[in-house]
Amino acid sequence: MAFCLGFIMNVRAAAASALYQVVDLGHSLSNALPAAQQQIRPRDHALLQEICYGVLRQLPRLESISQALMGKPLKGKQRVFHFLILVGLYQLSFMRIPAHAAVGETVEGAQDLKGPRLRGLINAVLRNYQRDQEGLDAQATSHDAGRYGHPGWLLKLLKESYPEQWQQIVEANNSKAPMWLRVNHQHHTRAEYQALLEQAGIVTTPHAQAEDALCLETPCDVHQLPGFAEGWVSVQDAAAQLALTYLAPQAGELILDCCAAPGGKTAHILERTPESQVVAIDCDETRLKRVRENLQRLELTAQVICGDARYPQQWWQGEQFDRILLDAPCSATGVIRRHPDIKWLRRADDIAALAELQREILDAMWQQLKPGGSLVYATCSITPQENRLQVKAFLERTPDARLVGSDPAQPGRQILPGEEAMDGFYYAVLSKQH
């Protein structure tokens, strides 16, 4: 739904509009949320995000409660009001907002969504929930989808893939993600920057393996971070920062960052090895704009190319690379805590299609690697089909490929969501024999 510029919208209405776009129209939350933020006061941005993330984390439970209270769901042009009801239910169930304010503000949201006649219905639904909250909550969490907040196909996949750990994964997926920083080694050591943060009253914890990573005790606005505008620090999860550890770039090498957007790993390579030549490719010109913006803020230089990794003949300049970082397109099932819309935008059959795309890119990139060079295969997924099984199949069909640093029976390192406070990620290091 679109609204005129200059109109200050009720936060609950803006949240309902964004949720409608994500769940019903299939838009990503990363697109829907900024559009909704433009309709509200800046001071309400955090509340909007909390509501949208929360509803998406608890969607099956809230849908179940709504169905029990209403019988027939709202349809057609009234669908956005269905999401307004979910917004109200989420506040009453999970937020510390006083009940009268949560109900009153949500009911008023109907006015901004051009549905004043539905205020009575929304008020009645929310009041009825308050009267029997315990019973309705128990009913809504009596089935797995409502209890765990995940679609059936994903729960099944997690249970099959991780029979001992699936509940911890689900819990991590439904939790708030911590804020990790990557200290720019060109300006400060991690210890030096941690001291600067401490002087600013910001408490952090270093990561044991990711050498430049600091975890904030309490997330904050990036503009509160010392030297952010000057490029002293960036926001990047510790798991993503491990790409540098596994890639181990050396000065003077020609390095390819494949599927590079939004450019965090490209920047990290250059921060640590400014003497290296880095080529960053991605097939999405819009997302490459982010790469260029990040490099500009950090005062780093890379060759940024828009190209399809499956068809290097269209963009490759003829010289093989010493190292390749292939952060492959994936299901993103390792970063659900940061992008809860993934649970509802992904479908079970996406996994096989993505695995086939990854296979094509991996085979194409292998031809661009020098003999003696190494390729790091990475995803922010936790599905075996995209990770361990993908690498196993690659090794079986590629005679000059060798796995580095892990057991061929269980190739690579699978990081699960929440492990050492990190996102879910996968890494495998492959060397090319002479």
From Swiss-Prot:
It catalyses: cytidine(967) in 16S rRNA + S-adenosyl-L-methionine = 5-methylcytidine(967) in 16S rRNA + S-adenosyl-L-homocysteine + H(+). S-adenosyl-L-methionine binds at C259, A260, A261, P262, G263, G264, K265, D282, D308, D327. One of its GO terms (cellular component) is cytosol. It is found in: Cytoplasm. The active site is at C380. PROSITE patterns: NOL1_NOP2_SUN (PS01153), SAM_MT_RSMB_NOP (PS51686). Keywords: Cytoplasm, Methyltransferase, Ribosome biogenesis, RNA-binding, rRNA processing, S-adenosyl-L-methionine, Transferase. Its main location: cytoplasm. It is an enzyme of class 2 (transferase). One of its GO terms (molecular function) is RNA binding. Gene3D superfamilies: Helix hairpin bin, NusB-like, Sun protein, domain 3, Vaccinia Virus protein VP39. InterPro entries: MeTrfase_RsmB-F_NOP2_cat, MeTrfase_RsmB-F_NOP2_dom, NusB-like_sf, NusB_RsmB_TIM44, RCMT, rRNA_ssu_MeTfrase_B, RsmB-like_ferredoxin, RsmB-like_N. It holds the Pfam family Methyltr_RsmB-F. CDD domains: AdoMet_MTases, Methyltransferase_Sun. GO terms for biological process: regulation of DNA-templated transcription; rRNA base methylation. Belongs to the class I-like SAM-binding methyltransferase superfamily. RsmB/NOP family. Specifically methylates the cytosine at position 967 (m5C967) of 16S rRNA. This is Ribosomal RNA small subunit methyltransferase B. It comes from Vibrio cholerae serotype O1 (strain ATCC 39315 / El Tor Inaba N16961).
